[in-house]
Amino acid sequence: MRHAESAQPGSVFLFSSRKVLLMSRFCITSVMHCLIAVVALVSSGFLQAAEQKRPNVVIIMTDNHGEWTLGCYGNKDIKTPHIDQLAQEGTLFTRAFANNAVCSPTRATFLTGLMPCQHGVHCYLRPRIQTGPDSYNTLEEFQTIPQILHDAGYVCGLSGKWHLGDNLYPQEGFSYWITKPHGASSGFYDQEVIEDEKIHKEPTYLTDLWTQHGIKFIKQNQDKPFFLFLAYNGPYGLGSAMKEPIKNRFKEEYEQLTFPSFPREKAQPWNFNYGDWIGDLGIIRKYAAEVSGVDDGVGQIMQTLKELGLRENTLVIFTADQGLSGGHSGYWGMGDHTRPLTAFDWTLTIPLIFSQPGQIVEGARQNMMVANYDVYPTLLNYLGLADKIPAKPARPGRNFAPVLKGKQIPWKEEVFYEFENVRAVRTPEWKFIERYHESPNELYHLTRDSKEHNNLIDDAQYKQKKDELKQELDQFFARYADPKWDIWNGGQSKTVLMTQKLFPKTYLYLPEPKKK
């Protein structure tokens, strides 16, 4: 009994201890679950806060558009108050350059950060690659800006010109998609557009249409991070689109002006098909009206951002695919409207403006030389996505995001250019142009000869400078060219070449067809 009696308290003790132990375990487990939930909520909050702090992105790209047409770049004839205001609210680059003369290669470079000898898009895409039976996305193997932003949680929308293949279907992370079946513009009214994977005739003035869809996309996605690629097909400046009468709101005013900002220089012998447009007031007025039409669209986009309270949290970039000569140096058009193909400044120079209130220096004019291939690393660094830049293929672009914040960084003043059989390197004072299986090569002292009329390539006193620049050019392409797409060394091209006869070993690359 004594043992029994003595055992009873022990049993009670063991039972109580077990109960306490079980209760303790339950409490600890509950506390741990609570802590995990709290940590998850806090982490989620931090992630949401981080996502909210990452700005929306609006990239506005125009087509065949020289920076010289804008008031903020000194033009006194053409009305561009909204783009001028954007420049006042951000940083304008006075020396920004395209790396090619035509639409598809420059757009491919802008979105990938790669040169044509790396991405394979050497000339503009013909219809068969855009909506025909052989259509495919020429950028599908690369990490592009929209694809990276999509993967980072952005909703991505395209309104306007694509011209990079398989136009009928949304590409590269875009979910909102309205575009043109082809790259070239035969006009701005009653044109075919692609919407909901179908082609239809659109009566709306195309510049207004792209703006309207840009606004629609912003409003639909105002509560989440978004990326809008607003790619106008104006001002364009070429073909039948310039023969079309002015119909936008600048018609009456512009038909009375003479636009002295368009040079009336003697047409140079290398003009291929537009030399007689120099000084043609009908063409000049139409081009000017289309520039101002784009400016109206920019104003509407900016007003929408402000009305929705999104302006401070939206990075806006304004640029063009490549420049255009409106008579400068005796040419009209781009570097593909000459024979031989050329690399003159009027085809390279483009507008470039970055703006985000409170984040980017306002009213700054930055004179450093930058190229369109520099935008890729700059944008991704600015957004905190530098770790998403692929290590391969190596990209030639440099990050100038600190400059947007007002900081000084080391910077080599040079840019590179590649258009089929033409490669060039440009510094502040010099430009060296080399041609593959064609002549002449060219050397210009730009500070003395800004119109690039006096070729010094055979001048003995500049041989050392020529050799230095040639070495720079050769080293650049030796470092970055991908043998698969390097047409100077037997590579392929995703586009038909204008200079195909010079590249007998190069053929049009077409991938295996895919089911759609």
Segments (PLM) and residue ranges:
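Long, internal low-complexity/basic segments
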Residues: 18-19, 50-55, 62, 66-67, ...
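Beta-strand elements within well-structured catalytic alpha/beta cores of enzymes
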Residues: 54-66, 85-86, 110, 149, ...
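Active-site segment of extracytoplasmic enzymes that catalyze sulfate/phosphate-ester chemistry
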Residues: 59-62, 66-157, 176-190, 381
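Short, solvent-exposed turn/loop segments enriched in Gly/Ser/Thr/Pro and often Arg
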Residues: 72-77, 91-115, 122, 127, ...
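Substrate-binding rim/cap in mid-to-C-terminal beta-strand-loop elements of soluble/periplasmic
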Residues: 111, 183-200, 270-278, 299-303, ...
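Formylglycine-dependent
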Residues: 122-151, 163-255, 260-288, 491-494, ...
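C-terminal cap/loop subdomain of S1 sulfatases and analogous C-terminal strand-loop tails that border
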Residues: 163, 170, 175-176, 181-184, ...
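Histidine-centered active-site microenvironments of extracellular/periplasmic hydrolases
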Residues: 170-180, 238-247, 303-362, 368-371
